[in-house]
Each structure stands twice: as structure tokens, then as C-alpha cells.
């Protein structure tokens, strides 16, 4: 359990204390990853099924590594090699896999609400690895973990999230978690990519990139979610990059020297980020990737039966 939660589906449901429970445990998990032998027996005898209906590099790989470092058995499932191609429904797929007695199902799906639907039909814990444009809770947690590492705290910090806010599940999870940890969040992007009423979640909205990033402690850059967009919402990627992309010149003129730059990946280089910025000294993008393993270890540990008060196995 994470606090009172059997599942990790939406950070909107998590309290500040429950978010901190995961982040604090992830500190110990990251220490395990620094060892020469990256293996602890914490989840020996447990099993994790990664149920991915969408493509993934970082999330799927890090959940698999997280499970294996904790000594859990990990099964990677792909829709293209399953009975989904024969017409099997999501619920039937999940119930059949759950009949094999896994402890955790990690699911990524193009439909918002898919992980919750699965959770209503299985007895094991369910982790959302991203569902449509709804949420991506583990990404929100690892972004906050990275910011705590780099900034010390999120309390009172200003975070700018720039890009396709309307179609980004990362933006929503980041917004929920960051505001609960005391950050001031600015959202920025084309007006056609800012959802109406988003200010009700505690953010302020800027349509000009400079207004959003000047004075910020961190900037989270997001790609355009082409796979979720029907009719074009922007004139083109060149125009988008000119107005909302971050290049070396803009970064030098507008960003504080100590400002850090995040991106959940994959990066569309030359669109939302220039290569010089993505690979530059202010970028913490690879730190995010590394921290993703530690945070997902913490999530699996807590949901598969670990107790944060008895985390000695992970620390031993």
C-alpha cells in the first residue's frame, strides 16, 4: 500500500504525505542502484506483469529493471504478440493474466481510464504507466524526485511546464504532485494546447515562452503529442519551435543560471528543445531516467507488500 492506496493510478488522489512516502523511500532505492551488485531480496517470490498497449522505451524498461533489482519476477507483455490481435478485450486480458497470480499489473494504454477499469476487475495492485492524456503518475513522482535532488525542496519554487498541455498525461501528473509539494506551476503553450479551466488545479497560464520561463527554478519541456491529435492545432513544427521551443540563445537570455531543464522523453530535437540545450549543463534529462528506476522500485516495493517502516532489506 502507498498510504491508503492499493493502486498507483492518479496523483490527484494522493496526499502530500503519500507522495513524500514514495519519494523518501526512493532515496534508499537509488542507493541500491549505486552498488556494484544491484540486487536486493526485498520482493523475492513476488511477480510483476508489464502490460503495454503503447510503445515505450524508458517506462517499460525501468519498471522491468526495478522489479528485477528487487528480486521480483518480471513478465513483459505486448499487445502485438497477444490474443488482443484476435479480439480479446482489455478486461478479459487483465483477468486472464491476473489468474496467473501476479502481485502487480503495470499497464500503459491509449485510453484514459484504462488502468482504473482494470483495477475494478482484478485483485492485485495496478500501476498506471500512462493512460491516454489522463495521467502518468510514476513520471510525475520521478520528476518531483529529480527536482528535490537538484533544488533541495519544491516548496516555494517556480516550475514552468511548456508544450502540449492538453494532450500530455505527464503535465497533469506533474501539476498534481508539484502543487501538493508547494511549488508554483506555470503552464505555457499554444492557446489551442492549453485546456480550458486548468487554472482550477492550481496553475497559472502563460502563452508566451519568455513569460513562463523567466525566473523559474525549473522548466519541464513537453513534446507535441501527434498521436493524440486529430486536426492540426498548430501551423507547423517550425513555427512551434520558433514560438515555444527552447534553444541555446533563449536559454542564455531568459533562464536563471541555476535553472534546471527536464523532459519526460522522447525528445523531438529541434522542435521543443535544441540539441545544445537537451545535452547542455542545465539539462537533468538523464538524471530523470536514472531516478525513474529508483522511484518505480519504491512504488513496486510498497504495492507488492513492502512496509516503509521495515525497508531494511532494500537498505542492507
From Swiss-Prot:
Keywords of the record: Pyrimidine biosynthesis, Transferase
Cellular component terms per the entry's GO annotation: cytosol
Keyword Transferase: yes
EC number: 2.1.3.2
GO biological process: 'de novo' pyrimidine nucleobase biosynthetic process; 'de novo' UMP biosynthetic process; amino acid metabolic process
Known pathway: Pyrimidine metabolism; UMP biosynthesis via de novo pathway; (S)-dihydroorotate from bicarbonate: step 2/3
Binding site for carbamoyl phosphate: 58-59, 108, 136, 139, 265-266
InterPro entries: Asp/Orn_carbamoyltranf_P-bd, Asp/Orn_carbamoylTrfase, Asp/Orn_carbamoylTrfase_sf, Asp_carbamoyltransf, Asp_carbamoyltransf_Asp/Orn-bd
Reactions this protein catalyses: carbamoyl phosphate + L-aspartate = N-carbamoyl-L-aspartate + phosphate + H(+)
One Gene Ontology MF term: amino acid binding
Binding site for L-aspartate: 86, 169, 223
PROSITE patterns: CARBAMOYLTRANSFERASE (PS00097)
Domain of life, per lineage: Bacteria
Purpose of the protein: Catalyzes the condensation of carbamoyl phosphate and aspartate to form carbamoyl aspartate and inorganic phosphate, the committed step in the de novo pyrimidine nucleotide biosynthesis pathway.
HAMAP family xref list: Asp_carb_tr
PANTHER family: ASPARTATE CARBAMOYLTRANSFERASE, ORNITHINE CARBAMOYLTRANSFERASE, MITOCHONDRIAL
Quaternary structure (record): Heterododecamer (2C3:3R2) of six catalytic PyrB chains organized as two trimers (C3), and six regulatory PyrI chains organized as three dimers (R2).
Similarity comment: Belongs to the aspartate/ornithine carbamoyltransferase superfamily. ATCase family.
The name this protein goes by in its record: Aspartate carbamoyltransferase catalytic subunit
Organism of this sequence: Anaeromyxobacter sp. (strain Fw109-5)
Gene responsible for this protein: pyrB
Amino acid at each position: 500500500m502507498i498510504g491508503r492506496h492499493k493502486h498507483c493510478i492518479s496523483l490527484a488522489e494522493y496526499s502530500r504525505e503519500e507522495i513524500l512516502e514514495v519519494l523518501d523511500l526512493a532515496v534508499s532505492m537509488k542507493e541500491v542502484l549505486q552498488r556494484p551488485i544491484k540486487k536486493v531480496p526485498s520482493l523475492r517470490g513476488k511477480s510483476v506483469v508489464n502490460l503495454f498497449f503503447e510503445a515505450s522505451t524508458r517506462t517499460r524498461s525501468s519498471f522491468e529493471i526495478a522489479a528485477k533489482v528487487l528480486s521480483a519476477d518480471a513478465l513483459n507483455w505486448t499487445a502485438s504478440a497477444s490474443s488482443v490481435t484476435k479480439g480479446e478485450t482489455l478486461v478479459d486480458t487483465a483477468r486472464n493474466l491476473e489468474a496467473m497470480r501476479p502481485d502487480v499489473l503495470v499497464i500503459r494504454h491509449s485510453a484514459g481510464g484504462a488502468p482504473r477499469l482494470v483495477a475494478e476487475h482484478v485483485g492485485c495492485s495496478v500501476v498506471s504507466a500512462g493512460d491516454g492524456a489522463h495521467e502518468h503518475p510514476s513520471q510525475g513522482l520521478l520528476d518531483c524526485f529529480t527536482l528535490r535532488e537538484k533544488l533541495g525542496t519544491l516548496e516555494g519554487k517556480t516550475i514552468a511546464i511548456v508544450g502540449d498541455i492538453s494532450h500530455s498525461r505527464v503535465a497533469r501528473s506533474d501539476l498534481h504532485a508539484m502543487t501538493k509539494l508547494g511549488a508554483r506551476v506555470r503552464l505555457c503553450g499554444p492557446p489551442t494546447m492549453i485546456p480550458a479551466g486548468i487554472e482550477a488545479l492550481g496553475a497559472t497560464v502563460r502563452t508566451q515562452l519568455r513569460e513562463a520561463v523567466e525566473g523559474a527554478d525549473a522548466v519541464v519541456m513537453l513534446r507535441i503529442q501527434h498521436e493524440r491529435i486529430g486536426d492540426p492545432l498548430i501551423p507547423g513544427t517550425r513555427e512551434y519551435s520558433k514560438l515555444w521551443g527552447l534553444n541555446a540563445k533563449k536559454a542564455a537570455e531568459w533562464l536563471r543560471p541555476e535553472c534546471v531543464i527536464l523532459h519526460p522523453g522522447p525528445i523531438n530535437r529541434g522542435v521543443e528543445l535544441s540539441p545544445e540545450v537537451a545535452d547542455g549543463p542545465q539539462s537533468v534529462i538523464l538524471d530523470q531516467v536514472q531516478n525513474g528506476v529508483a522511484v518505480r522500485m519504491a512504488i513496486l516495493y510498497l504495492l507488492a507488500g513492502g512496509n516503509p517502516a521495515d525497508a531494511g532489506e532494500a537498505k542492507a
